[in-house]
């Protein structure tokens, strides 16, 4: 975690002294895309979790990324789970984390977005989640308050109900809980569209640990409630390491790729599919795009390879 934070601080230093272009990629295919009201310069983005507090998204766009997802953000600041909580398995090009939505809270994140957005050239996604101490039955209130905060500033919102590191969060994926939550979110969005005259797409971030039956039901419930697409997928608790937490990286690649094919099969054609999880190289990106992904996110692959992955 310290290494990750130092790397981000170094990126900021390089940006501040106007040397960021030395590290920017000119190899990412640039084309004007329009997907669900999102105007993108390319299909490659940063996944939620890397820029938790919206302090670096403008720098990632300068490096060549077409979109950046910040967060996950909760209403109030959270310290997250006890440290150490990120473990690197270099031989396997894998991470296991038990972070637990550590972030500075919605007020400060919104301030950061307003501060850095004028320097940002890309699509900004904001991942939102319930607070650790919020009971499942009250989680909808957190998400609606967060929509109030971020709807206007976000190019899209990601509903995180799939992190394994916040207690009871995955309970929101059950059909009954999800139906209730997404009905509330859908109703709120209608109000916000009327208020701001802006249709901000809303995506649901999926867990790779769902059964096929649950996954199909989850997608049906989401589309019934006007969700615009899906992010496939979050970290998995199904791993070989003797550590509690969610695994990402190369060891997730096959599971995430297989799940993406199922999501593509189950979803309606109009629903957007963002591939995330185990994307480690250009071949992985191509494979995800071939298998119906509209956009692709990087996280652990970028942690291990840095900007060389873009080149």
Where do the PLM segments sit?
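Glycine-rich phosphate-binding active-site loops on the catalytic face of alpha/beta enzymes
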Residues: 64-78, 161-163, 229-237, 285-310
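Glycine/Thr-rich beta-alpha phosphate-binding loop at enzyme active sites
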Residues: 11-29, 165-177, 215-269
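Catalytic cores of alpha/beta
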Residues: 53-62, 141, 210-224, 265-269, ...
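Active-site glycine- and acidic-residue-rich loops that bind
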Residues: 131-143, 171, 177, 203-223
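Short beta-strand/loop segments at the ligand-binding rim of alpha/beta enzyme cores
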Residues: 37-46, 120-127, 191-210, 263-275
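Conserved, mostly hydrophobic/aromatic
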Residues: 46, 68, 109, 126, ...
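An N-cap/entry alpha-helix motif that binds or orients negatively charged groups
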Residues: 1-33, 97, 102, 106-107
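A gly/proline- and charged-residue-enriched helix-loop-helix capping module
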Residues: 71-121
């Amino acid at each position: 975690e310290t290494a990750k934070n130092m790397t981000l601080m170094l990126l900021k230093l390089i940006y501040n002294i106007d040397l960021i272009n030395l590290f920017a990629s000119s190899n990412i295919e640039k084309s004007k895309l329009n997907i669900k009201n999102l105007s993108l310069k390319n299909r490659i983005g940063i996944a939620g979790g890397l820029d938790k507090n919206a302090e670096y998204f403008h720098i990632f766009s300068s490096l060549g990324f077409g979109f950046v997802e910040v967060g996950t953000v909760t209403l109030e600041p959270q310290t997250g789970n006890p440290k150490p909580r990120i473990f690197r398995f270099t031989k396997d090009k894998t991470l296991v984390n038990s972070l637990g939505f550590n972030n500075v809270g919605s007020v400060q994140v919104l301030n950061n977005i307003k501060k850095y957005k004028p320097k940002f050239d890309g699509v900004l996604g904001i991942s939102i989640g319930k607070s650790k101490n919020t009971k499942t039955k009250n989680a909808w209130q957190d998400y609606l308050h967060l929509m109030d905060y971020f709807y206007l500033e976000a190019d899209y919102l990601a509903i995180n109900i799939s992190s394994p590191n916040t207690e009871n969060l995955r309970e929101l994926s059950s059909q009954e809980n999800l139906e209730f939550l997404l009905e509330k979110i859908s109703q709120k969005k209608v109000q916000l569209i009327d208020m701001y005259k802006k249709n901000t797409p809303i995506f649901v971030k999926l867990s790779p640990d769902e059964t096929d039956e649950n996954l199909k039901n989850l997608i049906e419930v989401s589309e019934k409630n006007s969700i615009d697409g899906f992010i496939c997928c979050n970290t998995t608790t199904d791993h070989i390491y003797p550590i509690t937490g969610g695994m990402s990286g190369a060891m997730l690649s096959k599971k995430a790729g297989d799940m993406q094919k199922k999501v593509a099969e189950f979803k309606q054609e109009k629903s957007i599919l963002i591939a995330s999880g185990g994307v480690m190289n250009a071949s992985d990106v191509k494979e995800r795009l071939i298998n119906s992904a509209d956009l692709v996110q990087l996280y652990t692959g970028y942690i291990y390879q840095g900007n060389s992955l873009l080149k």
